[in-house]
């Protein structure tokens, strides 16, 4: 098959089915060749809760794959989720907005609002990554993305405002041509850590000849009193210790807002084989999440120290760390468990041998008794047959 760019389809639940704690948004990447294709969410800003499935070769000789991200249901009305697809062999880049369907065929819905301009450019505004806003050594950025810019009107103008005051330090990247003969244009505004954490509002204003009026998008940190996360580490389950790999768990709860970063390390080196759930809204208005690190059982049993690092604005210095290792108490417990298992195995072996010997003894005794009784019975019968004639002779002589 010749080189072919993918078709991208957003996969989203209806708004009626997202009433639970989380919602799954998906992206189907179909009919491309050759491998590979890369899928990210919100231009890489969203990594938690993302799972991209392996590509599947279809009978047509073309590949397909899907990517799913799990997000809090409460965020669907306030945050934008974009599936970014990049197929380098065909020089194809596609951005698809994924959002719940607002109308349902089986229900009467009010008229859906008209888009800003049917077939014209669309604008999306993304917040900085939580880790970037919490570490002074990193640079937080607010990103404004314009898609579906036509060849006829390729020029896009960006104006940025912080709390209503225009700023001029944003950088606009070269426009990128998409598979559908449109352009994608990105402007990035570097922000101050404290400005973002203090709740300043950022506005991106986009002007283009294809638009009847400029499009404005605003974004800021979630409002509300920050709440400090509580961090707990959990060792592997005893049942899991029979396997070659074990799971170390980090529970982070009671935090607000949901912007948080969780990482793992061991002996000062980062650990990459971990998965972190998206923040889940709890009944008290705070959020919680779980992070699971998978390691070889041998590393755990050797006493290596594993640390769960959490970054959140409500923490002192925005950072805390909880460590976990095979402590003497846990080691003793595991040893006792193994010893108990060994003792039980030995006990069952002893019981089995005892029962076997007992049954053999009973069978032997029964057999011996049977032959003894048979011999005695035969002797008595023979003796009786010998005595009876003599007794009759004696009676005859007496008469």
UniProtKB/Swiss-Prot annotation:
Effect of residue 120 to A: Reduces the affinity for FCGR1A about 40-fold. Abolishes binding to FCGR2A and FCGR3A. Impairs ADCC of virus-infected cells by monocytes. Decreases binding to complement component C1q. Decreases complement-dependent cytotoxicity
CH2 as annotated region, ranges: 111-223
Residue spans crossing the bilayer: 351-371
Paired cysteines (S-S): 27-83, 144-204, 250-308
GO molecular function: antigen binding; Fc-gamma receptor I complex binding; immunoglobulin receptor binding
Gene3D superfamilies per UniProt: Immunoglobulins
Effect of residue 117 to A: Reduces the affinity for FCGR1A about 5-fold. Abolishes binding to FCGR2A and FCGR3A. Impairs ADCC of virus-infected cells by monocytes. Impairs binding to complement component C1q. Impairs complement-dependent cytotoxicity
Annotated effect of mutating residue 239 to E: In IMGT allele IGHG1*03
Record region (CH3): 224-330
Region listing for CH1, in residue ranges: 1-98
Origin: domain of life: Eukaryota
GO biological process, one term: complement activation, classical pathway
Outcome reported for the amino acid change (mutating residue 97 to R): In IMGT allele IGHG1*03
Oligomer status and interactors: Immunoglobulins are composed of two identical heavy chains and two identical light chains; disulfide-linked. Interacts with FCGR1A; this interaction mediates IgG effector functions on monocytes. Interacts with FCGR2A and FCGR3A.
Protein name stated in the entry: Immunoglobulin heavy constant gamma 1
Source species of the chain: Homo sapiens
């Amino acid at each position: 098959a010749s080189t072919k760019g993918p078709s991208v389809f957003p996969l989203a639940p209806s708004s009626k089915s997202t009433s639970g704690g989380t919602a799954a948004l998906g992206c189907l990447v179909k009919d491309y060749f050759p491998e590979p294709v890369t899928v990210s969410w919100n231009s890489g800003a969203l990594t938690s809760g993302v799972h991209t499935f392996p590509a599947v070769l279809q009978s047509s000789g073309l590949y397909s794959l899907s990517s799913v991200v799990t997000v809090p249901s409460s965020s669907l009305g306030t945050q934008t989720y974009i599936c970014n697809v990049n197929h380098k062999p065909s020089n194809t880049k596609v951005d698809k907005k994924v959002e719940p369907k607002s109308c349902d065929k089986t229900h009467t819905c009010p008229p859906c609002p008209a888009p800003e301009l049917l077939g014209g450019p669309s604008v999306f505004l993304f917040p900085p990554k939580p880790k970037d806003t919490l570490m002074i050594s990193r640079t937080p950025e607010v990103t404004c993305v314009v898609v579906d810019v036509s060849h006829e009107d390729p020029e896009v103008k960006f104006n940025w405002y912080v709390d209503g005051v225009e700023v001029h330090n944003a950088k606009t990247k070269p426009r990128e041509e998409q598979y559908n003969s449109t352009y994608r244009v990105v402007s990035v505004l570097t922000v101050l850590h404290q400005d973002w954490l203090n709740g300043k509002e950022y506005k991106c204003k986009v002007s283009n000849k294809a638009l009847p009026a400029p499009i404005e998008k605003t974004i800021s940190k979630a409002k509300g009193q920050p709440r400090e996360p509580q961090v707990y580490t959990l060792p592997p389950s005893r049942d899991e210790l029979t396997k070659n790999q074990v799971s170390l768990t980090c529970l982070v709860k009671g935090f607000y807002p949901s912007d948080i970063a969780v990482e793992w390390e061991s002996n000062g080196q980062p650990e990459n084989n971990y998965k972190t759930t998206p923040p889940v809204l709890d009944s008290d208005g705070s959020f919680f999440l779980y992070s699971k690190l998978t390691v070889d059982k041998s590393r755990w049993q050797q006493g290596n120290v594993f640390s769960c690092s959490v970054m959140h604005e409500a923490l002192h210095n925005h950072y805390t760390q909880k460590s976990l290792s095979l402590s003497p108490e846990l080691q003793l417990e595991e040893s006792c468990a193994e010893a108990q298992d060994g003792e039980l195995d030995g006990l069952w072996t002893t019981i089995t041998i005892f029962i076997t010997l007992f049954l053999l003894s009973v069978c032997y005794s029964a057999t011996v008794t049977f032959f003894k009784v048979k011999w005695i019975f035969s002797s008595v019968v023979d003796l009786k047959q010998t005595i009876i004639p003599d007794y009759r002779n004696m009676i005859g002589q007496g008469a």
